Each structure stands twice: as structure tokens, then as C-alpha cells.
């Protein structure tokens, strides 16, 4: 980025700021925010500023732009961090987690959804994987509907904490997951501050329910329900409750909820609303009474319980006194009436608990769907989306718990990014300048400590000792805190409240309600009333044994949140963390509105300045010696030998790699147990080199496979045309063993030809190209370029015009328009194409290849079987429909075709060829085998690890001790492969096995001897055996060895033997396949590096000598 652009848009990594201060950080974030660059890095930490509008900077196109890219290659983005986490999980095979922090409304939930979307998009697509992806993505709208709400600071505020673990298999595909939910804000069910809403699902149901649902659940407008009308806020800008309800129902289907389960959930949501409409008045005794019996009846009917049972559970509290029924003890039960305030509290407790338990069931149901296939998993990526730090005008127990969890997360961040990093430098002996920072451990101890007791412990003690009291407990709690914490730097007492100086600022908490909310108990008579419900789903949510519960000390809300926070920290500590620090730029929730004081406050309490200083002074990457060696050992030939192992010390291995990569000494340091790399660009360099290494190796393997596949296909084509021509056409000797090459005119570089064809090759695949001889009606001949693609047949004329070579397209015929082809039964090379309008007569010595390729692609395009006629009198059509005939005759005086006018058109004369009964099927063609290898030239070996393998030699080999290196035959002076002995004078080489019947033996193809790589070792990269004549072949050329004249007799037990040092898979029918350790009887040896041997099974063949150890 240029200085001019940076001055306008800001730098995308705060580590690169020229000056480092909180003001400079804020100014840089503002520049980027105003230019719609909402993401900024601090090294690996991502800062995200909520734009409060859609910037269209996510989705499939952006995902593709970040897929597989290193962080230094692409601009900051949530996708960048997600790619880093996913890559680290796959490469290091270690659990990862993404911790998203920031205050309410800063954009944490959206960041979490982007991560889940990215991981789903870049992973595999099997049926099971796609199912898990859908559940992961559809769980978001479902849980948001039941767990999110509009608050004063955020229109879609998460009112619960969620830690989502996505489980991956070894291939990096999601195969399952698990959601952990924390601290649902139950109090919102029954009360909301002015300008806020209850959970989204209530408004979605009332707006989007069908007419039938509204009748079944007796639904009306939000204004009709006490639990919704207290805040006078029913709609939200940018939220469509009708469409959101449809999305929720779709998500329920995707998750796999049955129709009955969906109906039960919607019924419970309606139940909560109807419970809230039960109002109370005071009777003449001062006790609570039902104001409207119809409201009670409606709520009871929705709960599927008797109205009298519900009424008694709300208006009376059952109190048991006395012993447990033993001798001398009497147990008494009393129904104590409640006043209006107590009845309201009981009603609200019932509604809160029903909704809370239904939400917990929903989370567990999503987990069941995620583990539907019960697939084993290798690693996880955890995504933490939890409520942000909250400071309101009036803060209570809920804010205290929320802020405690955020305090723990801040401590976790400090421990891993500031404190632990600096301590590690000292521990490893790395030169380092300490950076000062605020450690909030003191605040965490204040809240959860044991000695001295923390605030949660004091609150639990108050609730335990004063459990029977309902008044005065909050004041006792304040007094007890004052006695212990008076003078504490981060606690301050005041009338009816106390203040804590958190990392994000001082928050004042109203003590009223702390004790009751911490008890978090539901009266047992209420539980027993719900257990009477005739709705099985509702009753299952309250399946506890109330009798045994009464004997236990109840668990407090404070204890639960402390335990949950501890478990969360433990889960996070088992992962490699990645951080997203979300910033809310304003309170108006408007785009382009920047409140500098608010942003600066967040920059301060998030510790961004200290984070920048640590990153500038520290090292971008560190890892243990063995992991660095394992990751980068391919980058040095010394650490990446033929077996891929390094026998030396891990420290020396790391040094070797860095030195061979020419890394400057100042870019890296070696600690006591780890390697430290200073700049991310250096890591990027290593990763890029690693990718290139892998790409090069992959490309070689792919090329070898493509070559093998092409040659196999060529063999199949030759076998097919041999079958087609057998007993129908005489053959020319030089065409019997001719290999198919497809392109004989270097089409890729014939730009004039391509242009004449209107660049058809960009849309069509060229499958044959050559120069042909066009024969016209007067027997005149002219050269054309003929190109056959998978779609059409092209004829192009070349001519010189004004000293310039010009290509002119004569005609293009679609393959499906071809009516057929005709050829004679003699040995000529004439082909007559029967085409629309007029036919085309050509001569070309690759006629067999042309016809078989045309037959193949004619069928592939849907034309069926091409009509191929054999006749010595062929009728063909000229322009304007004139009919002509070309006839063929033999004359031994015409070794090449002679065409003259005569008869009804043209007469072609040619000498006799090989008999039509000649079988031209390739000798090494086996229709039942994939190994058609002996006709293939052996691939060349590459430097480094061996490539270029014969058929069957490419499988991974077991590791061998270095002392068992395979001996490599030494080349003779003069370089190159060692030449084989020349054939004996006076005739061809001896045939393999029994003498071949008939005439002179045919020329054989040489084969290259398997060679170990220069490092020695495994045959994993061996080539094919060198320079030996093919089976049944004639004289070997230069480098060939003399073949035996007759087959040798069966081996006798007294003959010498050899032991196989390595596995070998034969690449032709005359070679011998064997396994390491096999005993081979020696038949004969030659000087060309081959030994003829026989296994105990009687199988005989040739084996490379350097694979054997003679006994």
C-alpha cells in the first residue's frame, strides 16, 4: 500500500503504524471505517468495527477470494481469520477456537455466522457432510429466534452465551458438532426495559402464525400480552417478523424436529404469553386472588393441566415442617397463602423456568441432530459468541454475571497474548523488552476468589444462612461485602448498591434482587403441578424427583455461572485461540456515525495499544522444534530424503531448513524448546515454498497419470481399429505398430489455423490434427489441414497471398451431420467422408487413427454407431449433387497409390499389402488388465524424491534402513545409461522364449532399468527397467540386450538363487512380479542389468538385477 493510499484509508495492520498511541489507533480505525474497511489486523488478531449496514463484503465470491490464501496475501476479514484457523486445524491436527469479544451491539454474532458460513463453504460435499453443514447453518436462525432480543444498544442482541464446536474428520470436513449454552437471560421473559423487546420468537409467532395456529393457540396482537406490552416496543427497523418466523419453521425442518415437536414448542411459547396474563387482586384477608378466571382457564388449558391445580400452585406455597417421619418425629404440611407480590413472583418464576427449560431442550435437540451420523472426529474449531460487556443506568444480577464472564475472557486474552507471550520469551531465553499492561486477575479474584472469599461466595453464604427470609437479605449481602472489601482498589460500596472497577470501566450494581435471583429456585409444588400436565413434552421438561430435591442444598445461579465459566475456560485452553475484537462505533446504530470518545474507551479496555506494542516487539510465529521440522522438512533435501525422515536432532533439522532457505539470521531465533520467527512475511515465504513443493510433486504425478491414461486409451483405440479392419482391409506394414499421437501439426502454435477456425478450440477439444491430401474430381491433389474436434470436422486451405501465409476455412461439418465414411479393402490410405451437400475424398497415412477417433466421438456426441463401409467401388457426391465413383485395383508396380481419371470417375491403383487377416492388435494389449505399460516410454526421474514410476511402482513403500540402499548400476564412461550388448552378427536378436513363427522378428521397444534416487533407499520412485527388447521382439536397438534363442528348461533345485530386496510389479508379460523376501531361482543373467528367474510357483520372467541379492 502506497503512503498516499495509506494516509487516506489507513493501514490494514496496526503493527505497521508509524506512531503508536491510542489516538493514532482510533484515527486509523476511523479512516478505514469511513472508507468501508471495517476490518483491521493486529498481527493475527482481527478488529471488526460494526458498519451498521450491509457492505456486500461477504458471500461466495469473497469466500473464493480467501480460500487457501495465507493471511499476508489478502486484506483483513473474518474469512481471513477463519481460513487461518481452518488451515491450522488441518495442518497441525490441533483444536482451534475463535474468541469473539466486544460490547453488546459490536457485531459478534454476525462475525460468528460468517465463520460458520466460511467453514461450511470450503469443506467437502458428501451427503453426510452436507447434512451437518445444513444443521450448523440452520441452527443460527433457530437459536437467535429463541435467544436473541432487541435491547437499547443492539437490535439483535444475544441474550445467552454460545460456544459452538464444529467437529472435523481427518480430511477437514465437518462431521458433527456441539453447542454449549450459557446464562440465558430468563428475566427478559417477564420484563423488559422501555424501548426493548422480549425474545424474537414471541413477535415472530404473533406476526407469522397461520390462521389455524392463531385459533389453536388463541393468539392475538402483542399489545394484548403483559409480558410484551410493558416496554411499548413491538417492531424493530430492519427486522421482518413474518419472514423470520417462516425461516424459523424452515430451520426446525432442517434440524429434524418432528411435526409434533414443532407443535409442542410453539404451544409452549403461547403458554408463556397466556401465563403472563394471569393477574391478581387482593382479597379481604390481604391474600392474592385471581382477577380473571378466564385467563387462568386459558393458561391451564394451554398447559394441559387442571385450572384448580394451577391456581393452587400459584396462590399457595406448600411448606413442610418436622422430621422425615421417623419415631418421635411428625411431619406437617401447610398451604400458606401468598400475597399479590408473591403470587406475581411465583407466576413469573413459572414462566421463566418453562421458557428456560424449553430453550435448553432446543439446544440439546440441535446437538442430537449434529451427531445424527455419530461420525468419529479428529479435531474441532470452537466459536465463542457470548454476550458483550454491559453497562446500563440500572444494572442488576444479570449484568453482574454477564460482566464476570467477559472479565474471564479478558483474562484469558491477557494470559495468552500479553502475559504468556512475554513470559515465554524469558523462559526460552529470547531477547526481549518487557511491555507493561493491566492484568485483570485481581478483578476475577474479587468476584470468584476463595481466599479471601469472592462476591459469589459471599452471596451463596447469605442465601444459605438466610434461606427462609425474603426481606433484608440484599442489605445483609452489602454489609458483608463492606466488611471484607472496604479499601479494595476495584470495589466501592454505596447505599443500596456497590461498584466494581472492571477492565471495561466501573459499573454500579443495584443490590436489590441479588439474593432472590441467585437462589434461582422454583417451588416444588409448581414443579409437581407441571408434572401433572397431559402434554408429554412439557412434563418431560420437569422430570426431576421433588422428594429427593427437598433433601439437597439447592444449587445457586452464581455457582452455576462460576462452574460454566470454568468449564468454558478449560475448553478454550485446550485449543489454539484466534481473536476477533469487535468495536461499536456509536450508540445511534447508524452507518458512518463515529463517536471517538466511545471508540477510544473500547480501545483502552480491550488493550489494543498493549497488544500492538507486544506484536511490534515480538515474534509473529513460534512452535516447537519437532513441529517446525515436521511441517517444513520438505524444503531441504537434507531433511527430506528418499524416505522423508531426518535422523538427526530436531534443532539441527530446523537450522538446516532455514539455512537452505537462505533466511537471514535476524529473522529467526532458537529458544530452548521452540523456534521463533520474527516477521509474518518469513512464515509466508516458508508456506509459499511448501505449497510450491507440493504443487510441483502433484503436477508430476498428475502428468504421469495423464500420460499413462492417454497411452492406455491409445492401445484400446488401436485394438478396436484392428478388430474393425480384420478380414476387411489389407494393411501397410508401417501402420501395424504405429502409435497414435493425435496432433501432427503442432496445432497449439498454429495461430493462423486457429483464427481460420474462429478459435473453435477454445470451446471444442481438438482430438486429431494433420495435413491431408484432398483428391478432387479430376484426380488433382491439394494439401488441406484437417482438424477433428469433439464437436466438428474442419478442412482448412493454406495459401500464399502477397508473400503471407493465409489460412482459409473451406468447410466445417458438425459430427452429427456426418453420414458415414467409406474405405477400400486394399492397402491404400483413401477415406471418403459422406457429408451434407457434397462428400470429401482425402488421403492420409493415419487413416486408422482418423477413423477410430471419428467413430469414438461420433458416438460420444449422441450419433450412435458411425457407418463405416469397406468397398473397392465407392460412390460419392460432388457439389450440385453430381454422382461419381472411385474404384480401386491392385498392381505390384505401384508401391504407393496412383489416382487417375477413368471409368465413372477415378481409379486408384496400389500394390498388395499385408493380408486382411493380419491381426494388428497391439502385442501388449490385455483387455482385462489396466497394465498396458511395456509400450510406454519410462517417465524421467526428477530431482529430490523419486518420481516417474512404472506401472505398479508408485505405491507407498515401507521404510527401509538406510544401510539397505538398493545398488544403482554405474553408467559407463561417456554418460547416459549403460548400453546393452549388440546383437550377434548375421541376424536379429534371439527371440524371447520359443522362436517366433514366420518372417523376420519385429522391432522391439527398449525398456529402462529401475533406478534408485541419488539419496538411495526406497523403490518408491523407481523408473522402468532400461534398454531390453520387448517380448517377441526382434533386434534391440542401441542399448538393447541379446535375447535368448530358445526357452530354457525348467529350473532345477541345485540352481543358484537370489533373494528379492524390494517389491517389483511387472510392467509387461515377460517380466516377473515378486515381493520383498521372495526366493528366486536364477535361470540366466545378462550384462544389461536383467536377470531371468523363476519363482517357486513356476512363474518365470525377467527381473531387474539390482532388486536382487544373490545367495
Swiss-Prot record:
Sequence ranges of Gly residues compositional bias: 1017-1040
Knockout consequences: Shows defects in pseudopod formation and translocation. Also shows slower speed of locomoting, aggregation-stage cells and significant reduction in initial rate of phagocytosis. MyoB and myoC double mutant exhibits profound defects in growth, endocytosis and rearrangement of F-actin. Expression of the full-length myoB heavy chain in these cells fully rescues the double mutant defects. myoB and myoD double mutant exhibits reduction in the speed of whole cell translocation. myoB, myoC and myoD triple mutant exhibits reduction in the speed of whole cell translocation.
Gene3D superfamilies: 1.10.10.820, 1.20.5.4820, 1.20.58.530, Kinesin motor domain (3.40.850.10), Myosin VI head, motor domain, U50 subdomain (1.20.120.720), SH3 Domains (2.30.30.40)
Listed GO CC annotations: actin cytoskeleton; actin wave; actin-based cell projection; actomyosin; cell leading edge; cell-cell junction; cytoplasm; cytosol
Keyword Phosphoprotein: yes
Residues at which ATP binds: 102-109
Domain Myosin motor: 9-691
Region (Disordered): 910-1058
Chain intervals with Low complexity compositional bias: 929-944, 952-967, 991-1012
Predominant localisation class: other
Consequence when changing residue 332 to E: Forms a complex in the presence and absence of Ca(2+)
Annotated region (Actin-binding), positions in chain: 547-627
Similarity comment: Belongs to the TRAFAC class myosin-kinesin ATPase superfamily. Myosin family.
Protein name stated in the entry: Myosin IB heavy chain
Gene source species: Dictyostelium discoideum (Social amoeba)
Gene name of the encoded protein: myoB
Amino acid at each position: 500500500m502506497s503512503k498516499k493510499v495509506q494516509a487516506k484509508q489507513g493501514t490494514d495492520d496496526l503493527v505497521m503504524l508509524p506512531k503508536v498511541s491510542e489516538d493514532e489507533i482510533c484515527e486509523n480505525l476511523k479512516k478505514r471505517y469511513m472508507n468501508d474497511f471495517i476490518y483491521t489486523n493486529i498481527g493475527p488478531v482481527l478488529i471488526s468495527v460494526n458498519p451498521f449496514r450491509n457492505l456486500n463484503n461477504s458471500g461466495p465470491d469473497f469466500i473464493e477470494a480467501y480460500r487457501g490464501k495465507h493471511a499476508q496475501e489478502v486484506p483483513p476479514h473474518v474469512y481471513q481469520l477463519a481460513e487461518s484457523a481452518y488451515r491450522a486445524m488441518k495442518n497441525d491436527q490441533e483444536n482451534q477456537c475463535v474468541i469473539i469479544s466486544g460490547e453488546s451491539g459490536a457485531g459478534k454474532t454476525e462475525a460468528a455466522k460468517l465463520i460458520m458460513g466460511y467453514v461450511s463453504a470450503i469443506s467437502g460435499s458428501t451427503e453426510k457432510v452436507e447434512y451437518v453443514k445444513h444443521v450448523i447453518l440452520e441452527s443460527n436462525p433457530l437459536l437467535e429466534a429463541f435467544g436473541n432480543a432487541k435491547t437499547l444498544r443492539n437490535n439483535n442482541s444475544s441474550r445467552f452465551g454460545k460456544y459452538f464446536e464444529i467437529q472435523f474428520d481427518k480430511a477437514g470436513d465437518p462431521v458433527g458438532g456441539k453447542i454449549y449454552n450459557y446464562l440465558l437471560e430468563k428475566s427478559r421473559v417477564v420484563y423488559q426495559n422501555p424501548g426493548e423487546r422480549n425474545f424474537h420468537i414471541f413477535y415472530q409467532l404473533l406476526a407469522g402464525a397461520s390462521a389455524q395456529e392463531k385459533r389453536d393457540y388463541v393468539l392475538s396482537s402483542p399489545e394484548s400480552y403483559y409480558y410484551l406490552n410493558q416496554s411499548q416496543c413491538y417492531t424493530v427497523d430492519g427486522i421482518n417478523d413474518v419472514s423470520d418466523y417462516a425461516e424459523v419453521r424452515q430451520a426446525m425442518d432442517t434440524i429434524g424436529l418432528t411435526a409434533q415437536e414443532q407443535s409442542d414448542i410453539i404451544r409452549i411459547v403461547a403458554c408463556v404469553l397466556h401465563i403472563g396474563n394471569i393477574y391478581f387482586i387482593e382479597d379481604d384477608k390481604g391474600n392474592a386472588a385471581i382477577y380473571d378466571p378466564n385467563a387462568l382457564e386459558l393458561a391451564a388449558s394451554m398447559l394441559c393441566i387442571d385450572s384448580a391445580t394451577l391456581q393452587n400452585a400459584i396462590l399457595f406455597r406448600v411448606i413442610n415442617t418436622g422430621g422425615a417421619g421417623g419415631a418421635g418425629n411428625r411431619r406437617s404440611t401447610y398451604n400458606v397463602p401468598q400475597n399479590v407480590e408473591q403470587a406475581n413472583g411465583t407466576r413469573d418464576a413459572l414462566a421463566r423456568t418453562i421458557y428456560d427449560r424449553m430453550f435448553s431442550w432446543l439446544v440439546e435437540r440441535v446437538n442430537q441432530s449434529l451427531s445424527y451420523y455419530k461420525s468419529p472426529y479428529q479435531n474441532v474449531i470452537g466459536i465463542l459468541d457470548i454476550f458483550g460487556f454491559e453497562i446500563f443506568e440500572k444494572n442488576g444480577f444479570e449484568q453482574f454475571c454477564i460482566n464476570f464472564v467477559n472479565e474471564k475472557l479478558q483474562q484469558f486474552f491477557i494470559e495468552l497474548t500479553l502475559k504468556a507471550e512475554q513470559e515465554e520469551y524469558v523462559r526460552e531465553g529470547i531477547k526481549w523488552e518487557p511491555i507493561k499492561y493491566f492484568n485483570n486477575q485481581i478483578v476475577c479474584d474479587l468476584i470468584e476468589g476463595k481466599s479471601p472469599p469472592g462476591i459469589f461466595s459471599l452471596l451463596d453464604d447469605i442465601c444459605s444462612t438466610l434461606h427462609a427470609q425474603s426481606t433484608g437479605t440484599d442489605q445483609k449481602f452489602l454489609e458483608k461485602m463492606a466488611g471484607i472489601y472496604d479499601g479494595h482498589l476495584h470495589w466501592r460500596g454505596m447505599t443500596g448498591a456497590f461498584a466494581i472497577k472492571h477492565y471495561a470501566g466501573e459499573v454500579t450494581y443495584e443490590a436489590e434482587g441479588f439474593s432472590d435471583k441467585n437462589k434461582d429456585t422454583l417451588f416444588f409444588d409448581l414443579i409437581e403441578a407441571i408434572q401433572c400436565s397431559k402434554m408429554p413434552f412439557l412434563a418431560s421438561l420437569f422430570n426431576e424427583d421433588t422428594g429427593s430435591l427437598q433433601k439437597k442444598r439447592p444449587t445457586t445461579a452464581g455457582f452455576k455461572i462460576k462452574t460454566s465459566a470454568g468449564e468454558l475456560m478449560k475448553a478454550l485452553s485446550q485449543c489454539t485461540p484466534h481473536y476477533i475484537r469487535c468495536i461499536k462505533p456509536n450508540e445511534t446504530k447508524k452507518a458512518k456515525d463515529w463517536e471517538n470518545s466511545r471508540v477510544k474507551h473500547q480501545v483502552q479496555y480491550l488493550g489494543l495499544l498493549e497488544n500492538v506494542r507486544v506484536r511490534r516487539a515480538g515474534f509473529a510465529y513460534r512452535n516447537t522444534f519437532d513441529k517446525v521440522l515436521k511441517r517444513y522438512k520438505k524444503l531441504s533435501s537434507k531433511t527430506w530424503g528418499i524416505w522423508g525422515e531426518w535422523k538427526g536432532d530436531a534443532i539441527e533439522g530446523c537450522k538446516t531448513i532455514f539455512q537452505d532457505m537462505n533466511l537471514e539470521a535476524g529473522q529467526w531465533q532458537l529458544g530452548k524448546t521452540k523456534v521463533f520467527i520474527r516477521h509474518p512475511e518469513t512464515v509466508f515465504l516458508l508456506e509459499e515454498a511448501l505449497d510450491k513443493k507440493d504443487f510441483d510433486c502433484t503436477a508430476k504425478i498428475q502428468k504421469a497419470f495423464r500420460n499413462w491414461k492417454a497411452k492406455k486409451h491409445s492401445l484400446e483405440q488401436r485394438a478396436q481399429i484392428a478388430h474393425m479392419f480384420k478380414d476387411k482391409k489389407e494393411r501397410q506394414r508401417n501402420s501395424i505398430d504405429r502409435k497414435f499421437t493425435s496432433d501432427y501439426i503442432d496445432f497449439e502454435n498454429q495461430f493462423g489455423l486457429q483464427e481460420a477456425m474462429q478459435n473453435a478450440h477454445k470451446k471444442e477439444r481438438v482430438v486429431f490434427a494433420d495435413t491431408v491430401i484432398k483428391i478432387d474430381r479430376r484426380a488433382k491433389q491439394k494439401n488441406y489441414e484437417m482438424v477433428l474436434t469433439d464437436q466438428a470436422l474442419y478442412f482448412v486451405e493454406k495459401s500464399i497471398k502477397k508473400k503471407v501465409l493465409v489460412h482459409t476455412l473451406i468447410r466445417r461439418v458438425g459430427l452429427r451431420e456426418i453420414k458415414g465414411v467409406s474405405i477400400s479393402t486394399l492397402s491404400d490410405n483413401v477415406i471418403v467422408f459422406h457429408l451434407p451437400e457434397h462428400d470429401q475424398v482425402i488421403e492420409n497415412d493415419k487413416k486408422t487413427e482418423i477413423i477410430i477417433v471419428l467413430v469414438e466421438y461420433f458416438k460420444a456426441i449422441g450419433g450412435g454407431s458411425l457407418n463405416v463401409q469397406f468397398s473397392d467401388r465407392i460412390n460419392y457426391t460432388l457439389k450440385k449433387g453430381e454422382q461419381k465413383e472411385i474404384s480401386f485395383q491392385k498392381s505390384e508396380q505401384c508401391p504407393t497409390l496412383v489416382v487417375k481419371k477413368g471409368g465413372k470417375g477415378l481409379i486408384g491403383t496400389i500394390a498388395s499389402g499385408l493380408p486382411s487377416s493380419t491381426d494388428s492388435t497391439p502385442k501388449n494389449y490385455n483387455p482385462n488388465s489396466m497394465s498396458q505399460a511395456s509400450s510406454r516410454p519410462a517417465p524421467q526421474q526428477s530431482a529430490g524424491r523419486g518420481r516417474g514410476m512404472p506401472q505398479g511402482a508408485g505405491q507407498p513403500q515401507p521404510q527401509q534402513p538406510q544401510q539397505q540402499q538398493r545398488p544403482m548400476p554405474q553408467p559407463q564412461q561417456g554418460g547416459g545409461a549403460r548400453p546393452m550388448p549388440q546383437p550377434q552378427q548375421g541376424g536379429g536378436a534371439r527371440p524371447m522364449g520359443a522362436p517366433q513363427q514366420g518372417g523376420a522378428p519385429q522391432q522391439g521397444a527398449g525398456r529402462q532399468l529401475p533406478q534408485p534416487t541419488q539419496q538411495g533407499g526406497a523403490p518408491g520412485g523407481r523408473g522402468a527397467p532400461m534398454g531390453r527388447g520387448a517380448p517377441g521382439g526382434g533386434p534391440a536397438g542401441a542399448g538393447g540386450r541379446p535375447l535368448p534363442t530358445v526357452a530354457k528348461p525348467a529350473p532345477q533345485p541345485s540352481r543358484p538363487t537370489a533373494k528379492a530386496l524390494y517389491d517389483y510389479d511387472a510392467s509387461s508379460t515377460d517380466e516377473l512380479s515378486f515381493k520383498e523376501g521372495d526366493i528366486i531361482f536364477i535361470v540366466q543373467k545378462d550384462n544389461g542389468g536383467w536377470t531371468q528367474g523363476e519363482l517357486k510357483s513356476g512363474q518365470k520372467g525377467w527381473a531387474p538385477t539390482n532388486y536382487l541379492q544373490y545367495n
